[in-house]
Amino acid sequence: MMLISQPMADRPLSWSGLSRRPWRRQLAVTRVFLLFVFFLSWDRLTAPRSAQRRYRRAQWLVQQLLYLGPTFIKIGQSLSTRADIIPAEYIEAFTQLQDRVPPFDSRQAIAVIEQELHGAIDEIFQQFEVTPLASASLGQVHRAVLPTGEAVVVKVQRPGLDSLLNLDFELLHQTLRLAKRWLPGFRRLAQKYEIEAIYQEFFSLLFLEIDYIHEGKNAERFRQNFADYPRVRVPEIYWQYTTRMVLTLEYLPGIKVDDRQALETAGINLDLVIQTGICAYLKQLLVDGFFQSDPHPGNMAVDSQGDLIFYDFGTMAEVKIIAKDQMVQTFFAVLRKDTNQVLEALIYMGLVEPKGDLSPIKRIINFLLDNFRDKPIDIKAFDQVGEEVYAMFQQQPFRLPPQMTFILKSISTLDGIARALDPRYNLIAASQPFIQSITVAQPKRSLAMALLQQVKQFALDQLNRPSRNQQFLQELAAKLERGELQFATRSPEGDRLLRKIHLALKSLIFACLTGFTLLSATVLLSTVYARFAVVGFGLAGLFGLFLLRSLIKLAVQEKLDRLVQKR
């Protein structure tokens, strides 16, 4: 057996040995939580909320999540699907968590394998590579060869993960309870977004994900779903070498799916890869109702024949499948930009909750159909609309079901992979083989009737299409009915007054903070904690500088106002 030394992580990981020191874990989690709340409050106080500022804070938070370990890495990955809760900048930053998890010591991995499979590593495998092939938040993967000669990969769970997750479950539950009790703003947020339910759902899924027997069953089901698809490959599970903490799968090597240069060098047809990926995902979603909810590039590869390989079946999701005739109707609805029928299909599948005002969801569907139906998804266009979409989610009393957010994230990821291979790809063109397979599967009479009905509907839509003036009046009436009509007015005097009030409030807050910290430091001088007084005086000096800056700005603003009034 070949033994290869493994480099250790550069930074000590805070979750190691925590079962013996839970109080240190509590301090680490509390520190990150309080710092994050402080930074958000400081940003709101000292500067307008901007995408750039949020992005910097998101990068900082990613580093902290990596330091806190598996539970919090998974929380970040889960939050990257919640566009209805957090801004786009955080979603973008959280996607970086996929490939930045350091491996653990291979000696620990071997110890887990020997304990779970009841034998020495030399007896279990003919060959075992010590250096991990890949690592993730919950485990890492090693190559091996079975005694019967089959090449396999062995997925090993991080040691002590069970106790760590149980500890974090309790710590986060306590933190949520305290935050809801003492922070009124957080209490309102928790009620609006059902944070308690999200928390319970997250941990129930996480405990399922660390059960590798459950993942093996998912892989078998996925493999059976694609048994008749020769261009899609799914690794076989070796149950004799699989337990709750060890998963042994067939070794299927391939080129990373978004590595365009390597794929071209291997002579692989990129258009066919894109087509296979899009059609495979449509089949998962619309035919099987069982789909991979995290299809990032690390979970897919392309073999030497150009076939698509799927890995990692720990995070799967299910949706209600629709009948083939409904599917045909939905495709035609997309082609003719029928927002209402597309929305009906999403509600039927349980991807949108039919509660409250659905007009914002209609606007999103309309935006997608208008901008991305016949052309590649333009990231710049998404950037332009991202702020508006986030603001809409903040204002509306609804949230998307988890399945819908998984689908949105998956579509976005698949689109990114497709654009990396061919920036000019067309989603509808790539979906044609799947659409044809659906229509061919229909009985001829049923298909003819469906096509005739859709042609009739299209003709009626064209004949009854209102003029531009009529459309404008209809939209105006609809906005009035929904209470969405807004009138924008600007008053220079009002703007100046608001600026002065804002500066005066900032000055007052900084004055209070300066006085409070100065008083606290003075009191500390007369106690046994006198050495900490220097911190209080330092903070008082810092707040004093901010107070001085605010007062100068206020004085300058008053002078400018006087000059304007004289004119």
UniProtKB/Swiss-Prot annotation:
Domain of life of the source: Bacteria
Protein family per UniProt: Belongs to the protein kinase superfamily. ADCK protein kinase family.
Entry protein name: Uncharacterized protein sll0095
Organism of this sequence: Synechocystis sp. (strain ATCC 27184 / PCC 6803 / Kazusa)
